């Protein structure tokens, strides 16, 4: 706010009926009657998101809180639309993301966040080799937490990371649903996976942090202090490098 800058944003549509008019996801996915009737009228569709370039650079103190600020915005959206029970949209992976990492990530997501009711299906699903026994054998942990750590280690072996936004959703709610993956020819061929989050099922600490006014106030004070400390460290490091012969 002090800099009067837009950090980032989310395109969204607040749904009020069972007709998926103008929804981005409707171009690539078919919705079941159950989804149209019981979910869509109470849904906020989240479209393309962005973080402005000056907040994307690693090592820049500004970049630390960019994603957090976007979640603050989503929290405000939930508060302003009390009828909404679901967040629905697509998470994106680029074709430069290594396929073995992509497949391991999607296998994990479908294992722990399945769509057992076939609420949403892709019109042209991306061919994924998820039946390869390699992926099932990869996850030897006893629960979500252990297999999550295995996933992180495996992906890092290929010098990749779980995309930050996907990682945020994975740790937002235990009842998230993950649907099919498609290639989006209208946006450079990126690979997009549809997801659904039930707002009342969001972990209490996340809900408190991003949707309650008291939570916003505490979070803002905390982030201001963290930003002040990180900025001081950043300036100290810059000054030290500048004074070196």
Model-flagged regions — what are they?
Residues 14-176:
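Acyl-donor binding region in acyl/amide transferases
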